Regions:
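N-terminal pre-domains immediately preceding structured catalytic cores
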Residues: 2-209
Length: 209
């Protein structure tokens, strides 16, 4: 992606973000999905949080990327909690998201897609399970939670994972309507799939406040 296109992409993103400021306070919730297992670290699910009592549908995300051609690019707005997808400099898709919380902020800067893994699992967050796969201890952090005797680690699912720096990437997950992750960028599954299928290793990702 040349400098002229990058500049065009950034200016277009700023214009779109400015037009959408009025919608940044809407809350969204996806899940829990039974197939996701016990852990909710990466999905941001907290069954004790009253904000989860009313489920809402995603009425903002949209996709026309399959109809466009050209080099892809992504702009992520942490303030808006939205990801903007471009092809050939054209704005052709947008997804709501949930980025890192105050203790695990999503890094800001210019990155590129470094890894794609459709069935990725976290190496740090998940559950300790027994030999049959039944949870012994859920929602664990391997860095601080010791493994019980006889248990094994089962990493949290991060489907359609698109790594753009270190352990941080975009992936499908629950969205509570605010920044709630451990640094990753969670998206509705259908939008994560759209982005995943339309990026390559090296696709630029611009993360901004």
């Amino acid at each position: 992606m040349n400098a002229a296109f990058t500049s065009k992409l950034k200016h277009a993103a700023l214009a779109v973000i400015g037009l959408m400021l009025c919608s940044c306070t809407n809350l969204y919730y996806y899940g829990p999905a039974g197939a996701m297992g016990g852990t909710r670290y990466l999905e941001g699910y907290n069954p004790g949080d009253v904000r989860y009592s009313n489920q809402q549908n995603d009425t903002e995300s949209w996709w026309k990327g399959d109809e466009a051609s050209g080099a892809p690019g992504i702009v992520i707005s942490l303030r808006q909690q939205k990801a903007y997808y471009y092809k050939g400099g054209r704005f052709v898709g947008m997804s709501i998201l949930s980025s890192g919380d105050d203790q695990h902020r999503t890094p800001v800067g210019s990155f590129t897609i470094q890894q794609k893994d459709r069935h990725h699992q976290s190496s740090q967050y998940g559950d300790y399970v027994d030999a049959s796969g039944q949870p012994i201890k859920q929602n664990i952090d391997r860095k601080i939670d010791p493994m019980p005797p006889g248990a094994k680690y089962d990493g949290a699912n991060m489907f359609y994972f698109m790594r753009f720096t270190r352990g941080i990437g975009m992936h499908a997950g629950f969205l509570p309507g605010y920044a709630a992750s451990h640094g990753c960028v969670r998206m509705p599954e259908r939008m994560a799939a759209n982005f995943f299928n339309n990026v390559q290793i090296g696709t630029p990702v611009d993360v901004r406040n």
